[in-house]
Regions:
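Alpha-helical recognition/docking segments in bacterial nutrient-uptake
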Residues: 1-94, 158-159, 163
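Helix N-cap/beta->alpha junction signal
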Residues: 49, 85, 116, 143, ...
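Hydrophobic alpha-helical segments within soluble ligand-binding/sensing domains
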Residues: 81-106, 121, 125, 147-155, ...
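Flexible loop/turn connectors
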Residues: 155-248
Length: 248
């Protein structure tokens, strides 16, 4: 993904190596992060996601280890780099409204993720501002970002309401499933997705959240946090990267 390319570019410029910590579940991720932090294997951490009450973030914060979140935090004391996802969700919805669409479906990721919550809030706000009804049956949330989830949700939503005239999806994998269902059933419903976008997807537009810049700024910021920690400085960095809608 572009965000990794951005991180890798700046890491290379400053002669840093990158380690990636993954796990099939929260326990495995906690073990991997604990080994990195307590074993002093890395100088700092970048979390590539953000969710409520994350025990990994809590642990790293308590250890006063240099880190930042690529996303949102409710705490004012956690450094982060993010987009304005409420505005991005609003702009995506408004894009379709201005095209004359009135029954806009929303397919998002897990409700635990701040990015899903915020893009959905933007969707709700746009419908409200334009005096359009919010039908809960026209929304769906996937616990996993999988193509088949997008396919299944699209089938379910259209079976419920055949008047849906636009679909917003917050992830490119979900969008691929949406497009596959529409193509297989010869349906022409404009679809919009967020980064990163696969060229083969037949989208009306996508929200460019500037993932390359998100990655670059994230690494530059964690370097600053690492230096601040060495100098006993405490500064909470918060940066918002702009987005834009691009028509296909």
């Amino acid at each position: 993904p572009s965000v990794f390319r951005g991180i890798a570019q700046v890491a290379s410029e400053f002669h840093y190596a990158i380690q990636i910590a993954t796990g099939k579940n929260e326990k495995e991720r906690m073990e991997a992060i604990s080994q990195m932090v307590l074993g002093k294997r890395v100088d700092g951490l970048i979390f590539l996601y953000s969710q409520e009450n994350d025990p990994l973030v809590k642990m790293v914060s308590e250890e006063q280890f240099p880190f930042l979140i690529l996303g949102k935090s409710l705490s004012p004391f956690i450094p982060l780099v993010d987009n304005d996802n409420i505005q991005a969700g609003y702009d995506a919805t408004e894009y379709f409204i201005k095209k004359g669409c009135r029954n806009i479906a929303f397919i998002g990721g897990s409700k635990r993720l701040f990015v899903t919550q915020d893009r959905y809030k933007g969707y709700q706000k746009a419908l409200e501002d334009y005096h359009l009804e919010l039908d809960p049956q026209n929304t769906a949330f996937a616990n996993e970002f999988l193509e088949e989830k997008g396919y299944q949700f699209t089938k379910h939503l259209l079976n419920h309401d055949s008047k849906i005239d636009a679909i917003i999806t917050t992830d490119s994998m979900l969008a691929e499933g949406v497009c596959n269902y529409l193509n297989q059933n010869q349906l022409s419903i404009p679809t919009l997705a967020f980064d990163s976008i696969k060229p083969k997807l037949d989208l009306a537009a996508y929200v460019d959240i500037n993932t390359l810049e998100l990655g670059r700024i994230s690494f530059k910021t964690i370097l600053q946090i690492i230096n601040d920690t060495k100098e006993n400085r405490q500064i909470c960095y918060r940066q918002v990267i702009p987005h834009r809608i691009i028509e296909q």
